[in-house]
């Protein structure tokens, strides 16, 4: 029996795509801040050409998560996860946390020159 879709997968995909989209710029700064160093950190820039694809994937995943999480309660069948108010509130909170993280990750390459 298949598990009902509840938006969790789309949230995960959006967060992962945002992380991948900012790896070329945010990754080296985080690694240096954590004490890692070396010439290999510069190799993370090879992901820069794929950044638009990762951004698109993040935005599409967030759209589908939003569509799934903010659907009317009447669209949920009784007994489904989306019919439980506490679960709906938790998913909405997680959605907005992931959305903020995606926006930070997408905007970080434009702010990073101020840190160097």
Swiss-Prot record:
What GO MF terms are annotated?
A: mercury ion transmembrane transporter activity; metal ion binding
What InterPro entries has UniProt attached to this entry?
Answer: Transprt_MerT
List residues binding Hg(2+).
Answer: 24-25, 76, 82
Name the domain of life this protein comes from.
Bacteria
Its subcellular locations are: Cell inner membrane
Q: How does it sit in the membrane?
A: Multi-pass membrane protein
Q: Name one Pfam family in it.
A: MerT
User: Membrane-spanning residues where?
Assistant: 16-36, 46-66, 94-114
Per UniProt, the keywords (alphabetical) are: Cell inner membrane, Cell membrane, Membrane, Mercuric resistance, Mercury, Metal-binding, Plasmid, Transmembrane, Transmembrane helix, Transport, Transposable element
One cellular component term from this protein's GO annotations in UniProt: plasma membrane
Briefly explain the null phenotype: Mutation decreases resistance to mercury.
Function of the protein: Involved in mercury resistance. Probably transfers a mercuric ion from the periplasmic Hg(2+)-binding protein MerP to the cytoplasmic mercuric reductase MerA.
Family per record: Belongs to the MerT family.
> What NCBIfam families would the database entry show?
PRK13751.2
What is the name listed in the Swiss-Prot or TrEMBL entry for this protein?
Mercuric transport protein MerT
Q: What is the lineage of its organism?
A: Bacteria, Pseudomonadati, Pseudomonadota, Gammaproteobacteria, Enterobacterales
